[in-house]
């Protein structure tokens, strides 16, 4: 019997290419580019070859104080001041440079006032003549530094107030008592002098009493406060008294969430600011603008814990007076700084203290016919504040 021959080896079938793993499968972005641009913290504009604005993100609308409907289609030359270096940067990019930037650019318009910014212009590539304009306002560190300076000024007044309460009021009581004893046994002509002593002692005591509010170290009792209710209350008080001849303009954002604060203390802040604005405004044609807005604020770390307060609520008080003298600006929030004949110079020092106690930031910008004080305040967040057993006592200056 013939032996069966060995079976010939089967031809090897070529390996089937393995499908790529799902982890390597390219993922196409499914996010609308405008959503990503609106999430950026800086103003962004797209400008075409004709110099017209084609797109603005939310930050750009907030920065320039105009809506997208008003800005898109507007020539950039109508938005920026004449001879702005921004136009030169755009021209450089449209002539072939991929990117151009400049620091220290001043954008100053009647609506927003002066802003010192860094401008970056980048070629989009498609369409070829379109550019992306980014505005970066490097004022955060300056705001925090100024706020801490105001807090230090308030602390110095606090120490002085505590000292005065013990070291001045007690001797004054003795002086006043001695003057009253002298008055019982002196002539009528001398009683004029003893009454003068008593009146001046009372005046000094009243001043010390005003300063003692700075030494109040009790924690703030805070809750959700409607800032528009506060502003309306202060406006009515002002118009019924010291600001009866002032025209008030209200530019409120009705969608603002509540402030995390103390209502009475907030009233004191804005009553002081509005009173100063009314006294600075001209007798004829005086005008005060009260405005509120939501901004992407910084987060301040609170002392003694990990809690951070978001400061997105911006309240502005603007007047059309002559402006703040240059020699007062660097020390404006110090105690006893005033241009008023009978002023004590404690109003703005107290404002700085209360704003700091709320964990907020106060700043000002002044030029002839336009002085504005801006107060950034924390937003009430029930979920966040439920774990914060102790109210805040100012800011530590950390940025997150």
From Swiss-Prot:
Residues 163-381 form the Histidine kinase domain. Keywords: ATP-binding, Cytoplasm, Hydrolase, Kinase, Nitrogen fixation, Nucleotide-binding, Phosphoprotein, Transferase, Two-component regulatory system. One of its GO terms (cellular component) is cytoplasm. Residues 1-10, 18-27 have a biased composition (Low complexity). The keyword Kinase applies. Its EC number is 2.7.13.3, 3.1.3.-. One of its GO terms (molecular function) is phosphorelay sensor kinase activity. The modification Phosphohistidine is found at residue 166. InterPro entries: HATPase_C_sf (IPR036890), His_kinase_dom (IPR005467), HisK_dim/P_dom (IPR003661), HisK_dim/P_sf (IPR036097), PAS (IPR000014), PAS-like_dom_sf (IPR035965), PAS_fold (IPR013767), Sig_transdc_His_kin-like_C (IPR004358). CDD domains: HATPase_Glnl-NtrB-like, HisKA, PAS. It is found in: Cytoplasm. Autophosphorylated. One of its GO terms (biological process) is nitrogen fixation. Disulfide bonds: none annotated. Residues 1-27 are annotated as: Disordered. The keyword Kinase applies. Residues 29-99 form the PAS domain. It catalyses: ATP + protein L-histidine = ADP + protein N-phospho-L-histidine. SMART domains: HATPase_c (SM00387), HisKA (SM00388), PAS (SM00091). Its main location: cytoplasm. Member of the two-component regulatory system NtrB/NtrC, which controls expression of the nitrogen-regulated (ntr) genes in response to nitrogen limitation. Under conditions of nitrogen limitation, NtrB autophosphorylates and transfers the phosphoryl group to NtrC. In the presence of nitrogen, acts as a phosphatase that dephosphorylates and inactivates NtrC. This is Sensory histidine kinase/phosphatase NtrB. It comes from Azospirillum brasilense. The lineage of its organism: Bacteria, Pseudomonadati, Pseudomonadota, Alphaproteobacteria, Rhodospirillales.
